[in-house]
Amino acid sequence: MRSVDGSAVASAAPVSRFAGTLLDILDRVEYSRVRMDVTDNPIYRLRYQAYRREESVPFNDAGIVVDDLDNTPNGMSFGVHIDGQLVSSIRLHYLTAAQRHSPSMEVFPDVLTPMLDRGDRFIDPSRFTSDYEASLAYPALPFLTLRIAVMATVHFGATMCLAIVRPEHTAFYRRVFQSESMSDVRSYPGLAFPVTLYGARVEERRHHSIFSRYPFFMSTPEERHRLFARALDDQFEVPQPTTSRLAYERALLEAQFGGISVAAE
């Protein structure tokens, strides 16, 4: 039985103009997974350039930003490409009771440790950085980039997606992902601005609402497998096309004909 991560796109109503625009852009988007042991990858330079623009990190001769969490077994980094050009990047950690290395655990262990002990599993996104010109040309770039984190919550069966955010950015996470505050404001090592921890619990009702409003977050099992389960071979870093439109169209067909599960695999 075929399934997509569109938990019922409950109605076959047309998408909003905003969602339609992002579906069109995603037809031109590819995602690449990065080998964590190769520090000359362009995404590390993109990080450096983005942080230097805000003077969030000191100057270094290498012109890259890397840290110990780039090489943990539960970490993975991705580049976002539009028309073949690298425009943004993001790092994810799959945080479990057995694998407790992640940025959020560095700053908020008192919040997360009891939850991990209870069996909760988290996707912990970090290092979201973008090319300056691309951020002006594509104001919705955060949506295109954070889509990778949404796919990861589905692929790994996480119970919550975390977000270490600046206080002034919390409204975005509350509005888009229905995230809730989990901590006070704290300092993150190496960054010049304060952060707080937010989390979006992964529930069928909440996913249903998010996918209905933002269908471009949807994906197929095939796309998720290519990003998160690919073997470390010579194709590992090859950019992969997105499947938002295909997943959305499948969900509409399944909702139209009824009786077919559209829950995530």
Language model regions located:
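Short glycine-/small-residue motifs
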Residues: 89
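Beta-rich nucleic-acid/ligand-interaction surfaces
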Residues: 62-71, 168-171
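Short acidic N-proximal helix/loop "leader" segments that mark the beginning
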Residues: 1-26, 245-265
